[in-house]
């Protein structure tokens, strides 16, 4: 794989954010030793794949779409499917379990499939720093962030050094393969043990009733990126546009970083990752709030060749995601009155007159992933780990 070098990076305390790198070739080999690009050979990709677990969150997705995504992930990487699918009037989760079983057998690959609302999570998380994930119902709370964190814990329990995320609603299976290769390339070459790579979609298309239109950026991302960059510009007194991935669901990180940072609930999860880094390891650095200091956090942003194409979600979904994403900034120490005013103006333009919600947060530090997963899988009658 060949990627362009980022044109620049910017430093915010102990956070180093790189500008966008682009995939130049999915399967190319330069004739001479390159100095103007990053070349990762097949051996390096394979070595990194064995160190990576790919997490696939799913909720009521078309089974064929999910199957194509799972079959596109390199077999060297174990897969963790975290399902929040409905079980009535049809038990969609049971279909996902059977699909995972068949793929595990046919491809001879390790797949864990866990149900987000499995009651076994309650006992497994009890007494750990993550017990607040369980609500009054005795089940893990609803939300994408909660599902991503459960997937991270399972991946860490399976021995991963790196954890990558691939959405299950992707209609272009080849993009799941490309994302995986990007994760392997970026994290295997990272210079910090506390690293993350976030995907910048080259195009984001939605399948509507008529034609498909490919946008350069998603509607929510455009707003979130703008507010984050505006916020950083105020602090640095220099205008910046360094953040291109405020709502990047396709991402990967080192287990060391994932265990140290806080995780946001629901749709807040992707934006809150950046907010947490900047709050604690930029503004809070001198006050001793950055748990990874004197090390630094490295954030890479990479643009793939494949577009991200999924089903149309509707304006209501877009407004909800925007409000939740901006809420992570609004309720943080990053937000000056000027920033809060801009956020409220953005929400008013979407027909939302109230302050954005403050997300719940979870901190896994001090949790033993292997102990949690062993307890969970022993108690569960619904979730499975198909190992070969």
Curated annotation (Swiss-Prot):
In the UniProt record, the gene name given for this protein reads: mngA
Species source reads Aeropyrum pernix (strain ATCC 700893 / DSM 11879 / JCM 9820 / NBRC 100138 / K1)
Is Cytoplasm one of the keywords? yes
GO MF, one term, reads:
mannosyl-3-phosphoglycerate synthase activity
Q: Name one Pfam family in it.
A: Osmo_MPGsynth
GO terms under biological process: mannosylglycerate biosynthetic process
Q: Which family does it belong to?
A: Belongs to the glycosyltransferase 2 family.
Which keywords label this protein? Cytoplasm, Glycosyltransferase, Transferase
Localization recorded for this chain is: Cytoplasm
Question: What is the superkingdom listed in this entry's lineage?
Answer: Archaea
Q: What does this protein do?
A: Transfers a mannosyl group from GDP-mannose to phosphoglycerate to form mannosyl-3-phosphoglycerate (MPG).
GO cellular component: a single term: cytoplasm
* Pathway this chain belongs to: Carbohydrate biosynthesis; 2-(alpha-D-mannosyl)-D-glycerate biosynthesis; 2-(alpha-D-mannosyl)-D-glycerate from GDP-alpha-D-mannose (MPG route): step 1/2
The molecule here is called: Mannosyl-3-phosphoglycerate synthase
InterPro entries xref list: Nucleotide-diphossugar_trans, Osmo_MPG_synth
Q: Which reaction does it catalyse?
A: (2R)-3-phosphoglycerate + GDP-alpha-D-mannose = 2-O-(alpha-D-mannosyl)-3-phosphoglycerate + GDP + H(+)
EC nos: 2.4.1.217
Chief localisation class: cytoplasm
